[in-house]
């Protein structure tokens, strides 16, 4: 017997609006305020690590990571390792970037790293397919949508809030599944 219930996933997906979603105004979305505050555990989207490494994460994100319990997904590890594989070994900045990514992954506390289960993976694939159809996503955007859906549903199942700068995609996910939670920030320009 599979750990994934196909029929239950289809019943779950009845929320399909059968129409393209519109990005909501920032004022309607949960953004980090100027001051970090306590709250639910957070699950970090891959962009949080990347923005931190590139010096583009606002200071309030670092404060938030100090105040709240931060959790990591194997999805983020996978995306970070994909970046390592994509980097040109001949580029002069690659060695330093790979080293920074390695330190970032090694700094993740093992008891705070979570892998999605078959139910999350199956439902995320279904949700991602719906999102791609509704929004007309193609090629690269489809894989990104799948990873975002896995992270979003994983956070929901674990009772976490996704911390992300990916406002558009996670806004769509919040519209489809309002019981999920995301907290947004805007990456700053690199100095």
Report the location of each language-model feature.
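Alpha-helix capping/helix-boundary segments
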Residues: 48-49, 120, 151, 168-170
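Short, well-structured N-terminal submotif of metal-dependent ribonuclease cores
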Residues: 1-79, 84-102
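Short, hinge-like loop/turn segments at secondary-structure boundaries
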Residues: 87-92, 132, 180-183
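Acidic, PIN/NYN-like endoribonuclease modules and their adjacent C-terminal/linker elements
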Residues: 1-33, 152, 156-191
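Active-site neighborhoods of divalent-metal-dependent phosphate/nucleic-acid chemistry enzymes
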Residues: 2-9, 21, 27-29, 84, ...
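Acidic, glycine-rich loop-and-strand cores that form catalytic or ligand-binding grooves
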Residues: 104-108
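Short beta-strand scaffold positions
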Residues: 44, 72, 115, 146, ...
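Phosphate- and divalent-cation-binding pockets in alpha/beta enzyme and binding domains
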Residues: 79, 123, 172-173
